């Protein structure tokens, strides 16, 4: 089911800048028992992204209500919200563009997540590296060609997810998830000021770890440094947290961090 600017429809104007330039942002939320998990965080993410992309929006109360309505109809599943700058403007220029377009859709919850949660995730190093751009770093914008290529290469392997470096070789994230690793009592996660997506569940885990006995450090780390970990986990708003059992030839057997985070992230407030 799709809602475009509050109307049930599945067609979008070809002049919309989402199709012309990927000019917009999106978020993907989990629906549990008819409610959007971490609803306020998802709306805040969209607001922050629109501000950084200089997209003017005045429909936030309507959007929140539409998200709640679709979630109630789906009960359990996935809610995706896309915001584009709308139509207009000549070429790349944003002058005379808008109003912004909002697109909501609901789909079923990924059936394979339960199996992966039980068996653990295997990671493969991606040959595709992320470009560094502080103007876009952290935003879940509509330009996802890097992730499309990462996924295409991943599907030629037997791994479940990809470990992705940036163009300078620093560990950044996975194809569709953020990454944490633990060495002793210290938990590390990559800095995302140059590349990567600052995920909703990553933010939630950081808040949890700040209140825990673990020491959290946001780092610029090499692949070799990250693979010296005692344990790895990945997370996104849908998973929400999964243990990594192997990355390439390196195996992980500890699940201490996962066992701490998993129950707290399953139904986050």
Swiss-Prot record:
One of its GO terms (biological process) is 4-aminobenzoate biosynthetic process. The keyword Lyase applies. Its cofactor is pyridoxal 5'-phosphate. One of its GO terms (cellular component) is cytosol. It catalyses: 4-amino-4-deoxychorismate = 4-aminobenzoate + pyruvate + H(+). Disruption phenotype: Cells lacking this gene are unable to produce PABA. PROSITE patterns: AA_TRANSFER_CLASS_4. One of its GO terms (molecular function) is pyridoxal phosphate binding. Pathway: Cofactor biosynthesis; tetrahydrofolate biosynthesis; 4-aminobenzoate from chorismate: step 2/2. Keywords: Folate biosynthesis, Lyase, Pyridoxal phosphate. Its EC number is 4.1.3.38. SUPFAM superfamilies: D-aminoacid aminotransferase-like PLP-dependent enzymes (SSF56752). The modification N6-(pyridoxal phosphate)lysine is found at residue 140. InterPro entries: Aminodeoxychorismate_lyase_IV (IPR017824), Aminotrans_IV (IPR001544), Aminotrans_IV_CS (IPR018300), Aminotransferase-like (IPR036038), BCAT-like_C (IPR043132), BCAT-like_N (IPR043131), Class-IV_PLP-Dep_Aminotrnsfr (IPR050571). Belongs to the class-IV pyridoxal-phosphate-dependent aminotransferase family. Involved in the biosynthesis of p-aminobenzoate (PABA), a precursor of tetrahydrofolate. Converts 4-amino-4-deoxychorismate into 4-aminobenzoate (PABA) and pyruvate. Homodimer. NCBIfam families: pabC_Proteo, PRK06092.1. This is Aminodeoxychorismate lyase. It comes from Escherichia coli (strain K12). The lineage of its organism: Bacteria, Pseudomonadati, Pseudomonadota, Gammaproteobacteria, Enterobacterales.
